[in-house]
């Protein structure tokens, strides 16, 4: 073999082949560990096409899927958290906020928008778990209240998707206040006869589950969502007992009457539209026009 043949017959190393694959093209399902093409997963709304596992989804992406295109107006987009208490644990709170804002591109853990769903006016909000575990602080509470007030003003339904570890400990009492604040505005909505639909996604825990997340006129969950106050590991360590299989999962809660229904993410938009049209006494967007014979 000549020296030219030797050069051109060399196979590229596995390292060089890996280097040619752009970062972020592939990901792994957190349930079945199947390697998935990122774009395919995005087309399936972050639901594994192999096992059906519902992964966590960005708040803005969720609202863009729910609401009609070109109908969205963000609510309280200018609100930004402040480190009033100068709180510090392993890191300063202001540094945690800066890091979360840089990583997510959001100012805080809740995004709220007004828009339409199949032409029907609604207000919708969604938690971003990637922002400090979706924890509820002053800004999350304020955004939720402003969204609810807008729903009351427009006499249109309010839908909120929760994904949170609970109250934000770095805001101490200011965070706990939001439980009462959000519950109070929902009482006002109930008094005015404006529907509130709570959609609990994985995970919904702590002060969020103990306040607005479980106060819906209808409480809906995504499949296998973890829902509760304390997490299962904390409960097991406290009571020193093994918990039942599937304890605190959406299916367990549905079986025991704690939630009203479970809806697949791919069906959420259509089913919410159907439910809300009934609650608002409006024609369903999916009814076929009646044909009257001559």
Curated annotation (Swiss-Prot):
- Which UniProt keywords are given for this protein, alphabetically ordered? ATP-binding, Cytoplasm, Fatty acid biosynthesis, Fatty acid metabolism, Lipid biosynthesis, Lipid metabolism, Metal-binding, Nucleotide-binding, Transferase, Zinc, Zinc-finger
What EC number(s) are associated with this protein in UniProt?
A: 2.1.3.15
Q: Report the GO molecular function annotations.
A: acetyl-CoA carboxylase activity; ATP binding; carboxyl- or carbamoyltransferase activity; zinc ion binding
Which residues of this UniProt protein bind Zn(2+)?
29, 32, 48, 51
The free-text note explaining how the cofactor binds reads:
Binds 1 zinc ion per subunit.
What Pfam families does the record point to?
A: Carboxyl_trans (PF01039), Zn_ribbon_ACC (PF17848)
Q: In which pathway does it act?
A: Lipid metabolism; malonyl-CoA biosynthesis; malonyl-CoA from acetyl-CoA: step 1/1
Keyword Methyltransferase: yes or no?
no
First-level EC class: transferase
**Assigned GO CC terms:** acetate CoA-transferase complex
Keyword field contains Ribosomal protein: no
Q: Which PANTHER family match?
A: ACETYL-COENZYME A CARBOXYLASE CARBOXYL TRANSFERASE SUBUNIT BETA, CHLOROPLASTIC
* Subunit text: Acetyl-CoA carboxylase is a heterohexamer composed of biotin carboxyl carrier protein (AccB), biotin carboxylase (AccC) and two subunits each of ACCase subunit alpha (AccA) and ACCase subunit beta (AccD).
Q: Which family does it belong to?
A: Belongs to the AccD/PCCB family.
- Function recorded in the entry: Component of the acetyl coenzyme A carboxylase (ACC) complex. Biotin carboxylase (BC) catalyzes the carboxylation of biotin on its carrier protein (BCCP) and then the CO(2) group is transferred by the transcarboxylase to acetyl-CoA to form malonyl-CoA.
Protein's recorded name: Acetyl-coenzyme A carboxylase carboxyl transferase subunit beta
Query: What gene codes for this chain?
Result: accD
